[in-house]
Amino acid sequence: MALTKAEMAEHLFETLGMNKRVAKEMVESFFEEIRGALESGEQVKLSGFGNFDLRDKNQRPGRNPKTGEDIPISARRVVTFRPGQKLKTRVEAANTGK
């Protein structure tokens, strides 16, 4: 099961007593800030959570899996996420039942 933006807004409404509209706007604004920073080429560091980075990938040879035909995969910029140590520790603890 995936956590959605709507569920995040609902959680803000329930735990902080925010107006539902304000909670939804806050979640949207949070993700818009991340998108904007990445579009500007900036790294996004969320302390205790992890980092979103941009990585340039070179062009490389690929293959069409249906036809076996060689095709070039163009150079591109991708977003990567590196979880922070605190996040890793908490996820590992949750998965091992600690």
Curated annotation (Swiss-Prot):
Keyword field: DNA recombination, DNA-binding, Transcription, Transcription regulation, Translation regulation
Record region (Disordered): 49-70
Annotated Gene Ontology cellular component terms: cytosol
CDD domains from the UniProt entry: IHF_A
Gene Ontology molecular-function annotations: DNA binding; structural constituent of chromatin
A family per Pfam: Bac_DNA_binding
UniProt GO BP: DNA recombination; positive regulation of metabolic process; regulation of DNA-templated transcription; regulation of translation
UniProt xrefs under NCBIfam families: himA, PRK00285.1
Sequence similarity: Belongs to the bacterial histone-like protein family.
Descriptive protein name: Integration host factor subunit alpha
Gene responsible for this protein: ihfA
